[in-house]
């Protein structure tokens, strides 16, 4: 089954083709992402109406480009998957409308995909994918969650942020220190040059039981340290390093607790912050110490993309799910409410070859 995936939940337009007849990395026939960073930079954040209009402009050309790269005609598609939520309602409707129209014209099934399930399943597109049960850390600009995955589609949220997501904290902290938009990647790059230990910030909510997160207090700590400093380039880098170390260590501590809670030894990390080099290294080290395994998608598939939507959609279409003809989106959507994917798992998609 060749499935077209469309991602338009926020400020990236993503399109991909996933082929279930193949396995591992080659199954992703083609994917392309258009980022709206330049469009929103002057506003210091995403403007929903501008995001929606830009998806309208970019989506169809990106579909044509992706099909060309995959070497496919549009009538060779067997299904269409699109992000149905969570996300910005206008942006979601653009992708959903195009997807439903294509599916109707091609007389193929369509499926709305949960954006965070797409992130969670992205590592399964790699060679030697992880198998349930595992714990997933979903860490991005809008979400920070620990999820127990007992089977594909069977999700239990073990903990989540009570305020800012980790990626949001990166972006806001960077903005406080005068770094350009988008701040998170800029702050991480700056932290590479900072002196470890010069600034040491609290590891929020690690001194008590539980798996929830809170990053708003850490953000305030950094603001006070910045305002009380000489605000030199060197100090900016040192504070960035201290902030990043605090976030990474907090995430690592909570991940290890979650593995103990779920009684498993495999950790999956996905979402934009999952591309952070220091986070990857720290979690790899922690997994090796306990004789476990940590799995990441390739960095290009950590941020929002159509590949994860095509893959998650392929799993659900193979399981016999499909959407009706209505164009529906769900801006707020609890992933735990999704139906299990036992049939898709039995089909072998995303499983190791025997």
From Swiss-Prot:
GO terms for biological process: tRNA threonylcarbamoyladenosine modification. It holds the Pfam family TsaD. It is found in: Cytoplasm. Binds 1 Fe(2+) ion per subunit. Its main location: cytoplasm. Belongs to the KAE1 / TsaD family. This is tRNA N6-adenosine threonylcarbamoyltransferase.
């Amino acid at each position: 089954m060749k499935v077209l995936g469309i991602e338009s939940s926020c400020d990236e337009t993503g399109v991909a083709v996933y082929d279930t007849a193949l396995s591992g990395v080659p199954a992703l026939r083609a994917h392309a992402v258009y980022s709206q960073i330049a469009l929103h930079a002057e506003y210091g954040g995403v403007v929903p109406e501008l995001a929606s209009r830009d998806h309208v402009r970019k989506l169809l050309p990106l579909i044509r480009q992706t099909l060309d790269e995959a070497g496919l005609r549009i009538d060779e598609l067997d299904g269409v998957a699109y992000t149905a939520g969570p996300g910005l309602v206008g942006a979601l409707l653009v992708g959903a409308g195009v997807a439903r129209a294509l599916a109707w014209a091609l007389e193929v099934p369509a499926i709305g995909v949960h954006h965070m399930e797409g992130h969670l399943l992205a590592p399964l597109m790699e060679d030697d994918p992880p198998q349930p049960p595992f714990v997933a850390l979903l860490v991005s600009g809008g979400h920070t969650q620990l999820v127990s995955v007992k089977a594909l589609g069977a999700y239990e949220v073990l903990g989540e942020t009570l305020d800012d997501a980790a990626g949001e904290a990166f972006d806001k902290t960077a903005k406080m220190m005068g770094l350009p938009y988008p701040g998170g990647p800029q702050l991480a790059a700056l932290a590479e040059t900072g002196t470890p230990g010069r600034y040491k910030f609290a590891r929020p909510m690690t001194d008590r039981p539980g798996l929830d997160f809170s990053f708003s207090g850490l953000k305030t700590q950094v603001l006070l340290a910045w305002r009380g400093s000489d605000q030199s380039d060197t100090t900016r880098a040192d504070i960035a390093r201290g902030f990043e170390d605090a976030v990474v260590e907090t995430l690592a501590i909570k991940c290890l607790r979650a593995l103990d809670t779920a009684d498993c030894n495999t950790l999956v990390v996905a979402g934009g912050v999952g591309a952070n080099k220091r986070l990857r290294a720290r979690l790899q080290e922690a997994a090796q110490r306990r004789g476990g395994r940590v799995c990441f998608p390739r960095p290009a598939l950590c941020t929002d993309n159509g590949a994860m939507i095509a893959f998650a959609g392929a799993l659900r279409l193979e399981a016999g799910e499909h959407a009706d003809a209505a164009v529906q989106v769900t801006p707020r959507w609890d992933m735990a409410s999704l139906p299990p994917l036992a049939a898709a798992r039995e089909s072998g998609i995303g499983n190791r070859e025997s």
